[in-house]
Amino acid sequence: MDYEFLRDVTGQVIVRMSMGHEAIGHWFNEEVKGQLTVLTDVEDGARSVAGSERQWRRVGHEYTLLLDEEEVMVQANQLSFTTDELEEGMSYYDEESLSLCGLDDFLTLVEKYREFILH
């Protein structure tokens, strides 16, 4: 999972993720937006599920983050889409709507994001 942190002209931090992990970048860009308390909540959530089979969820405006002791899933809060509505020969692209990664990798990303924000 590769990522890059950038600042736009307004100073807002932008996260760019490698292919297959785009939804994680969108989660940072849309739900975190530099608010370190969101990251603290997620880290607390990760600690709360450690050593258990429980899951922890944070529903945001655009994306929902779901984690367990091993994995993180970020999914867009879009309305369900039925393929019956598509015209023949068309397909629905949702690669940027759902991403999975290991919990340890995600927590490392959270730590690096926080460091980038603070420096």
From Swiss-Prot:
It holds the Pfam family UPF0231. It comes from the Bacteria. Signal peptide: none annotated. HAMAP family: UPF0231. Belongs to the UPF0231 family. This is UPF0231 protein ECA3777. The lineage of its organism: Bacteria, Pseudomonadati, Pseudomonadota, Gammaproteobacteria, Enterobacterales.
